[in-house]
Amino acid sequence: MRIDQSIINEIKDKTDILDLVSEYVKLEKRGRNYIGLCPFHDEKTPSFTVSEDKQICHCFGCKKGGNVFQFTQEIKDISFVEAVKELGDRVNVAVDIEATQSNSNVQIASDDLQMIEMHELIQEFYYYALTKTVEGEQALTYLQERGFTDALIKERGIGFAPDSSHFCHDFLQKKGYDIELAYEAGLLSRNEENFSYYDRFRNRIMFPLKNAQGRIVGYSGRTYTGQEPKYLNSPETPIFQKRKLLYNLDKARKSIRKLDEIVLLEGFMDVIKSDTAGLKNVVATMGTQLSDEHITFIRKLTSNITLMFDGDFAGSEATLKTGQHLLQQGLNVFVIQLPSGMDPDEYIGKYGNDAFTAFVKNDKKSFAHYKVSILKDEIAHNDLSYERYLKELSHDISLMKSSILQQKALNDVAPFFNVSPEQLANEIQFNQAPANYYPEDEYGGYIEPEPIGMAQFDNLSRQEKAERAFLKHLMRDKDTFLNYYESVDKDNFTNQHFKYVFEVLHDFYAENDQYNISDAVQYVNSNELRETLISLEQYSLNDEPYENEIDDYVNVINENGQETIESLNHKLREATRIGDVELQKYYLQQIVAKNKERM
């Protein structure tokens, strides 16, 4: 497959890397650049840097990064062609892929993508079955009676799976999809006795489940006739894994970043109703506990998480367990306590959207405040529990990262123990870091290294200084490169990465007139070389080289080659001494070739 270079350039020019990365990483301005937690490996202290000026990103921990295409390839685990297509769709640039297409009606790049295509194609027919067929009328009425407008149904892509064992099966087969792959995607079930396939979802209202990029990867089928189970979800598949999926994250991401808060609900139905009521930063897990993968992803967007679970005993227990775990992970945890026996959907149905949004805004407690209010009766009447929970709450408050929030929690919690905030503070070890949290350094987190200046440059070895400075000057402009390219033998570089960078610059200037790091990284396909390019970019040398400066670097680099010739001469003399004619011929040929390269 090949994409015209002009299309690639247009997409790159229209895609701002800061906007792109911000969809996945919570970034903070630090000097000239932005920093955040790396999306490619788990970390507690930010080491991922984005340069808006240079349009590149780079992790100083795992070394991954690059321009907008390489970031997209890495974050979505897709090919370069797929990344170009994805970003092209994002900026409304049509991507014409020059390739010989197969005769199949289904053009795909991987099994995973084909599975997603199946889900998205069948969604259109589920929606049609719900809104345009007689068989779907009862399901549609059921939704409408529960406040689902036509606009909301369309927005959420809700549909209806007919009461047929082969509706989905026959449709996908006619479209040319592999039935075994449809089974692996979770759309079909299989009779293990005769290995026949049939629809997994029948006579159910179908709610699409999307990944963080907004692609449909699964379904939740809800009964409307009382059959069990109430909800039938897609099974675990290569594209649908509950421990990684947060419902509504694709829609809520921007609001989460803007509000610097994520609100976690128990179910996707609560999310739909809460979002409709005006609460836009809401997500839910798919019937599973909040996983480490969930927490890692949340961390990249915000450090503030609010739990709003059902107002029953199970909801309270889940809030205490989840909140404790989140607090241990270094997040700021808050709780919205719904009235007894109610969930968000029921609250909205009873009091209306405005009352719900006001309640969410005004009834938010810190996790410590919520916890002590739940345990207040036991604290008041059980002296053993009093001591236990005093220590627990003291520790919980110590885990809070903000001193202001700590003081607020002290004021809220102390009255439940009939002590002053000062007395409660005495129980707290403020210098105790959470068990699973790495404290920030003395500057409050990762400090972006400054570009290497002259002082650091002087500390390098003579050879390394020459090689790095020489390449840095070649990066300034094409004329400098052309003037000096023939002056140096690439094999004289002591650093193999520099040798390859030298070749990269040759390829780059063959197609470009002006050096740009964002474009240059597209010419390398390894993290090590990308790291070398970015490292060279950080060198801060004189604006203009002094007279003969570059020539001096050339001489130093070529001295390494001369040393190689001297070594060959020594070996030639030794071969002559011992009378090895074959070795003499070999070393003589090497010396002649080496001298020709230097002419």
Swiss-Prot record:
Its GO CC terms? Answer: cytoplasm; DNA-directed RNA polymerase complex; primosome complex
Query: Where in the chain are the CHC2-type zinc fingers?
Result: 38-62
An example of a Gene Ontology BP annotation on this entry? DNA replication, synthesis of primer
The EC number(s) given in the record are 2.7.7.101
Occurrences of domain Toprim (ranges): 260-341
Judged by the first EC level, this protein's enzyme class is: transferase
Question: Which residues does Mg(2+) 1 bind?
Answer: E266, D310
Provide the cofactor note recorded for this chain's UniProt entry: Binds 1 zinc ion per monomer. Binds two Mg(2+) per subunit.
Keywords, A to Z?
DNA replication, DNA-binding, DNA-directed RNA polymerase, Magnesium, Metal-binding, Nucleotidyltransferase, Primosome, Transcription, Transferase, Zinc, Zinc-finger
Q: Which InterPro entries match?
A: DNA_heli_DnaB-like_N_sf, DNA_helicase_DnaB-like_N, DNA_helicase_N/primase_C, DNA_primase_core_N_sf, DNA_primase_DnaG, DNA_primase_Znf_CHC2, DnaG_bac, DnaG_cat_HB
Q: Name one Pfam family in it.
A: DnaG_cat_HB
What are the GO MF terms of this UniProt record? Answer: ATP binding; DNA binding; DNA helicase activity; DNA-directed RNA polymerase activity; zinc ion binding
Q: Which residues bind Mg(2+) 2?
A: D310, D312
User: Could you confirm whether the keyword Nucleotidyltransferase appears in this record?
Assistant: yes
Give the residues annotated as coiled coil: none
User: Which cofactor is recorded for it?
Assistant: Zn(2+); Mg(2+)
Reaction(s) catalysed by this chain's protein: ssDNA + n NTP = ssDNA/pppN(pN)n-1 hybrid + (n-1) diphosphate
- Entry comment, domain topic: Contains an N-terminal zinc-binding domain, a central core domain that contains the primase activity, and a C-terminal DnaB-binding domain.
**Member of which family?**
Belongs to the DnaG primase family.
Role summary: RNA polymerase that catalyzes the synthesis of short RNA molecules used as primers for DNA polymerase during DNA replication.
Subunit structure of this chain's protein: Monomer. Interacts with DnaB.
Q: Which HAMAP family match?
A: DNA_primase_DnaG
Which protein, by its recorded name, is this? DNA primase
Which species is listed as the source? Staphylococcus aureus (strain MRSA252)
Q: What is the lineage of its organism?
A: Bacteria, Bacillati, Bacillota, Bacilli, Bacillales
